[in-house]
Amino acid sequence: MLQPKRTKFRKMHKGRNRGIVVNDKINFGTFALKSVDRGRLKSCQIESARRAITRAIKRQGKVWIRIFPDKPITQKPLEVRMGKGKGNVEYWVALVQPGKILYEMSGVSKELADHAFKLGSSKLPVRTVVTGI
């Protein structure tokens, strides 16, 4: 699963997922899966969607992942009293805004790209739309 090799600090503030999207253009491929909602994608969700997409295209084309989970999410263990500091890092997330490109694909037909992105988007917690050049 995706996660940073090293970070300056182990834990991060919760923060807010606001603002406008930065990478809303297709850079590498010819088709793209674009987010419609605002949310957080876990690294395991990103990986399972990638697997579904690559299996659907039967390794014909090329797939690019345009998001990276760089925000640590902490959790305290079950049945632990409040206080005693912040919990341990449980998983990593990527913050997603509307219009953000999640995956790109090239080397396949439009129908196959639509089918593959439909299978991949079912693994993600945000609504998505397929776009092309």
From Swiss-Prot:
The keyword Ribosomal protein applies. One of its GO terms (biological process) is translation. Keywords: Ribonucleoprotein, Ribosomal protein, RNA-binding, rRNA-binding, tRNA-binding. One of its GO terms (cellular component) is cytosolic large ribosomal subunit. It comes from the Bacteria. The keyword Ribonucleoprotein applies. It holds the Pfam family Ribosomal_L16. PROSITE patterns: RIBOSOMAL_L16_1, RIBOSOMAL_L16_2. Gene3D superfamilies: Ribosomal protein L10e/L16. One of its GO terms (molecular function) is tRNA binding. Binds 23S rRNA and is also seen to make contacts with the A and possibly P site tRNAs. Part of the 50S ribosomal subunit. PANTHER family: 50S/60S RIBOSOMAL PROTEIN L16, LARGE RIBOSOMAL SUBUNIT PROTEIN UL16M. Belongs to the universal ribosomal protein uL16 family. This is Large ribosomal subunit protein uL16. The lineage of its organism: Bacteria, Pseudomonadati, Pseudomonadota, Gammaproteobacteria, Enterobacterales.
